[in-house]
C-alpha cells in the first residue's frame, strides 16, 4: 500500500477492513524521511490527530513499514542525501519530529519503538532516502526479502 500524501479516511478505512476482515498483512511502502514517518505512516497506523473520535474505524495498527530503513543505506550502499537548510519542507518536518517525539503518545508506546528509533535517527543524521533507492539493488540478491520491519 502506498499513499499520495497523508492517507484519507477512505484509504485508512479500506486498510482497516482488509486488516480486520481478510486477515492479510498490510505493508506500507514509503520514503525514509521525517514527513513520511510522522505524518503518512503514523496516520495510517493510528489515525488522524484531527479526528480522534473515530480513529479506531480509520486506522490499521498492524500495518508494517516496507521501505528504506536507516541500516539499509549502508548495508545496500543506497543513495541518500542530507537535508539542506534551504529545504523548508524537510526542515519543518524535522522540527515537528522533535516535537512529536516528546509530545505524541503514539511515539511513547513500546509497540512503536521501531518507528521512534527511525525518527530519532532522522533527527540526528539529518539525512533522507527515497524509496526509489531500493531499485538500485539487484532483485536477485538473496538478502532483499529479509527487509520487512517496524
Spans of features found by a protein language model:
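TOPRIM fold recognition
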Residues: 9-150
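Metal-dependent catalytic core segments for phosphate chemistry
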Residues: 1-6
Amino acid at each position: 500500500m502506498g499513499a499520495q500524501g497523508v492517507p484519507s479516511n477512505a484509504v485508512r478505512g479500506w486498510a482497516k477492513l482488509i486488516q480486520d476482515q481478510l486477515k492479510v498483512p498490510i505493508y506500507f511502502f514509503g520514503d525514509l524521511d521525517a514527513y513520511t514517518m510522522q505524518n503518512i505512516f503514523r496516520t495510517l497506523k493510528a489515525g488522524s490527530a484531527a479526528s480522534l473520535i473515530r480513529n479506531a474505524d480509520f486506522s490499521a495498527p498492524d500495518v508494517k513499514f516496507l521501505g528504506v530503513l536507516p541500516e539499509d543505506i549502508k548495508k545496500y550502499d543506497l543513495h541518500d542525501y542530507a537535508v539542506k537548510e534551504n529545504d523548508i519542507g524537510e526542515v519543518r518536518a524535522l522540527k515537528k519530529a522533535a516535537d512529536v517525539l516528546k509530545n505524541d503518545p503514539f511515539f511513547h508506546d513500546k509497540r512503536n519503538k521501531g518507528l521512534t528509533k527511525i525518527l530519532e535517527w532522522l533527527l540526528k543524521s539529518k539525512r533522507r532516502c527515497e524509496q526509489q533507492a531500493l531499485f538500485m539493488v539487484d532483485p536477485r540478491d538473496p538478502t532483499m526479502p529479509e527487509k520487512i520491519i517496524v
